[in-house]
């Protein structure tokens, strides 16, 4: 890796934009947690996994906010603490994002049910919290976390650029898992989407009348189908700028300090919670309707299904039904 360039200066407007992104992400993650607490009947297994992703994103947004606000000029105790928290939360967010995709694949395509599902969720907890924690503790103990001149961050602390094996630790504390997610997320969601499309085609051969009604009204599964494409697409669009700056830093390119790249990197790393909120709250009719009713103080009408709509699953059964496999966003 070439000798690090002079520190990237974080302009006031850049800092303001990234701080706003942190706040919106924290609010979005908090809203996801609140909807989970308010409405027990929406607590499918997939949305419970989404809850843990939201907690990781909330911690990530808070730690990034402090780092951007401080705009560290060197390694200090709070720089190391902030770097450790953001490293743990960010890496955990990668693991939970992939865990949700893997869960949907196994549940919908492989029809995994019963005790196997419970064991799978426990495995997700062990890996998605345990691996990031172990990596972060090792990085702190070996004094790898510190000031990074904002070349691979946007004001916050991450891996100390003075460390000789900094590239290895950058990979271990985020970039390796980030690049794996670029591959796994599109692959898993495309497999799920392909399976659902095949199921719909087979069903339409035996239920042409039902299918016609769905086409007239707009099939509830069509929104889930779109989100199966949007979930990995949004993840990549947010995270790719971080990867671009990482590669530019490895090459010693001065382009790494370009204001546009800096801002895109800052938003991409901090807005994951906000993006999840848009996808799984604001773009989810069942949650959005209840939320608007609550905010506007309107009494929520008794659950009523329009003609042709599927019956809402009972508590805990959203992911268990084989007829209408649910994305945690439908």
Curated annotation (Swiss-Prot):
Functional summary from the UniProt entry: Orphan receptor that promotes neuronal differentiation of radial glial progenitors (RGPs). The activity of this receptor is mediated by a G(q)-protein that activates a phosphatidylinositol-calcium second messenger.
Basic and acidic residues: compositionally biased ranges: 317-330
Protein name: G-protein coupled receptor 157
Principal location class: membrane
Topological domain spans for side Cytoplasmic: 37-48, 109-119, 188-227, 283-330
Localization, UniProt: Cell projection, Cilium membrane
Family, as annotated: Belongs to the G-protein coupled receptor 2 family.
Sorted UniProt keywords: Cell membrane, Cell projection, Developmental protein, Differentiation, G-protein coupled receptor, Membrane, Receptor, Transducer, Transmembrane, Transmembrane helix
Listed transmembrane segments: 16-36, 49-69, 88-108, 120-140, 167-187, 228-250, 260-282
Residue intervals annotated with topology Extracellular: 1-15, 70-87, 141-166, 251-259
InterPro entries named among the record's database cross-references: GCR1-cAMP_receptor, GPCR_2-like_7TM, GPCR_2_secretin-like, GPCR_Rhodpsn_7TM
GO BP annotation list: adenylate cyclase-activating G protein-coupled receptor signaling pathway; cell surface receptor signaling pathway; circadian behavior; phospholipase C-activating G protein-coupled receptor signaling pathway; radial glial cell differentiation
Annotated segments matching region Disordered: 303-330
An MF annotation (GO) of this entry: G protein-coupled receptor activity
Membrane topology: Multi-pass membrane protein
PANTHER family: G PROTEIN-COUPLED RECEPTOR 157-RELATED, G-PROTEIN COUPLED RECEPTOR 157
Coiled coil: none
SUPFAM superfamilies: Family A G protein-coupled receptor-like (SSF81321)
Recorded GO CC terms: ciliary membrane; plasma membrane
Pfam families in the cross-refs: 7tm_2
